[in-house]
């Protein structure tokens, strides 16, 4: 059927009459390459520790976690490197809330995640594509003395993609910190409060690549296939880092008068700065406002606006005003 499909598309048949006869009488290999290169299941381990407590003035929460996950792809470790896909993830979360005064409280939230990912040099998509391209009649995947076998139509056999092409080792670090204070101004007028938050986020992504090539041997036993030769590992490294700093300020007012008149309003200010190695900085400013009036929990009218801008646009056209009004 595969031969016929190729012929219908104007291609060349994949299997010769000799291979078809050999596959029928059992003299030709009949590999299930998916079963050869894929595991039935992949293990995953997850551990978490939580600590929380406090009193009327101070409350805290600490969570530490570890995750280890293996891959469904069946890779083989060699003397120089391990191409098996493995994920190690560590994360720590720490939150503290402090009541400084009857009207004033603050918080500090911190979250750190570290990922370490080891895998082969080639991606999962390339490997899966190779598995489905390999004909079941191809012997191997390696000879008794460890030589990689391939077919004429497949320059990159699955075994070589997984085990003989190299590796990559990636480290990712993500840090998030937020500090905020909330002041209840109810002593001035009921329902009025102000809030400020300073946030910081930093991301690091670094990868070490070890790439190599390997000799291929023809499935028909004629010797070397193509011009590929076995090469020593070639190492390279990439690293990227970026950070965000933002400030948010809010003035909130929420109050009900006479049991039927509801007023909800706020004004907020947002400022964000981003830096990334090799790129120009990015700045954004936003001023937002919202006011809503409700009567008897049935009729509402609401107005909102955003005054938003960034230095990414040309001078004189960096800020825009976006108003909206609705009623129900």
Where do the PLM segments sit?
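Surface-exposed loop/turn segments flanking beta-strands in extracellular/periplasmic regions
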Residues: 2-28, 126-157, 208-235, 262-265, ...
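Flexible loop and strand-edge segments within Gram-negative outer membrane beta-barrel domains
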Residues: 25-65, 69-72, 83-157, 166-174, ...
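Extracellular loop and loop/strand-boundary signature of outer-membrane beta-barrel proteins
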Residues: 34-37, 78-82, 95, 162-168, ...
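Structural signature of outer-membrane beta-barrel channels/translocons
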Residues: 52-56, 65, 97-99, 103-105, ...
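Membrane-embedded beta-strand positions of outer-membrane beta-barrel proteins
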Residues: 62, 108, 179, 194-196, ...
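Outer-membrane beta-barrel translocator domains and adjoining extracellular loop/strand segments
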Residues: 73-79, 119-125, 207-213, 276-282, ...
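Short secondary-structure subsegments characteristic of cysteine-rich extracellular domains
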Residues: 77-97, 197-199, 318, 322-326
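Structural signature of Gram-negative outer-membrane beta-barrels, strongest in the C-terminal barrel
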Residues: 99-101, 235-248, 254-328
